[in-house]
């Protein structure tokens, strides 16, 4: 064993002896008053002291780098929001353009349908007018033939029956004249309906005008029917009064002959 090792061994021996003596020594009881003083009072809460975090030695915290990274993160989030906004705006603009195209296409389809319906209605009106004209021509031709036949019959008949037939023909001619007058009045009041050049608003106004006109005609018809009914009632009342008065007049005209009424 070397001299250094012997010296260390000798130093360790007294230290071990002192530790054994300390363990063998009995612990002295602390006074009760000291223990009570050492207890924390319940009325005052104990606040632990604030200890600043320890920065490990050998490591350097770069606050500029932290700030730069945070700024880069915020900038990236802002750029993402901007990209999302412009993408959404582009999508909305595309939807708006598609909607406008659909509206224009639908408007063109409606215009084409309206043009087709107008053309069909014009053809139908032309056919109706042609059919009406053909029927009128046939009726006029038939009427002329009937008139020629009747005139021929009248010229061959005798004078006795000729006057009667002439009067009948004159009455019939008067009725035809009244019918022709009625047709003329209706043709004057019946205005042609030209709606080819009208737009949607003008058609709506025209329909409202026709509806108001129909209501007015119905009102006038109702008033005339009521007036006609009242006139018929007054005529019947007057006729009954005249009949009743004539009965009394016939009774008053009888005379008394030989004590008896005849």
Curated annotation (Swiss-Prot):
UniProt biased composition (Basic and acidic residues): 32-41, 107-149, 177-197
Alphabetical keyword list: Muscle protein, Phosphoprotein
Modified residues (Phosphoserine): 2
Presence of keyword Phosphoprotein: yes
Stretches with biased composition (Pro residues): 43-55
GO molecular function: tropomyosin binding; troponin T binding
Location of the region described as Disordered in the Swiss-Prot/TrEMBL record: 1-59, 107-153, 165-197
Any one Pfam family match given in the protein's UniProt record, by short name: Troponin
Regions annotated as coiled coil: none
Name this polypeptide is given: Troponin T, slow skeletal muscle
Species of provenance: Sus scrofa
């Amino acid at each position: 064993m070397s001299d250094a090792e012997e010296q260390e061994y000798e130093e360790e021996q007294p230290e071990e002896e002192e530790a054994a003596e300390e363990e063998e020594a009995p612990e002295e009881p602390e006074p009760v008053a000291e223990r009570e003083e050492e207890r924390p009072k319940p009325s005052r809460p104990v606040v632990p002291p604030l200890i600043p975090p320890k920065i490990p030695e050998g490591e350097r915290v770069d606050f500029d780098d932290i700030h730069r990274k945070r700024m880069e993160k915020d900038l990236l989030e802002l750029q993402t929001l901007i990209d999302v906004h412009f993408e959404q705006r582009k999508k909305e603009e595309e939807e708006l353009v598609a909607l406008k195209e659909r509206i224009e296409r639908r408007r063109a389809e409606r215009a084409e349908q309206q043009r087709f319906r107008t053309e069909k209605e014009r053809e139908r009106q032309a056919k109706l007018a042609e059919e009406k004209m053909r029927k009128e021509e046939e009726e006029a031709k038939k009427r002329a033939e009937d008139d020629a036949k009747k005139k021929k019959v009248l010229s061959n008949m005798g004078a006795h029956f000729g006057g009667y037939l002439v009067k009948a023909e004159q009455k019939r001619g008067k009725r035809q004249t009244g019918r022709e007058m009625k047709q003329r009045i209706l043709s004057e009041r019946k205005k042609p309906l030209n709606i080819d050049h009208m737009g949607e608003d003008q058609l709506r106004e025209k329909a409202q005008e026709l509806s108001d006109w129909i209501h007015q005609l119905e009102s006038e018809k109702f008033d005339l029917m009521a007036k006609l009914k009242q006139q018929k009632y007054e005529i019947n009342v007057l006729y009954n009064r005249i009949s009743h008065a004539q009965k009394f007049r016939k009774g008053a005209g009888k005379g008394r002959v030989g004590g008896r009424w005849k």
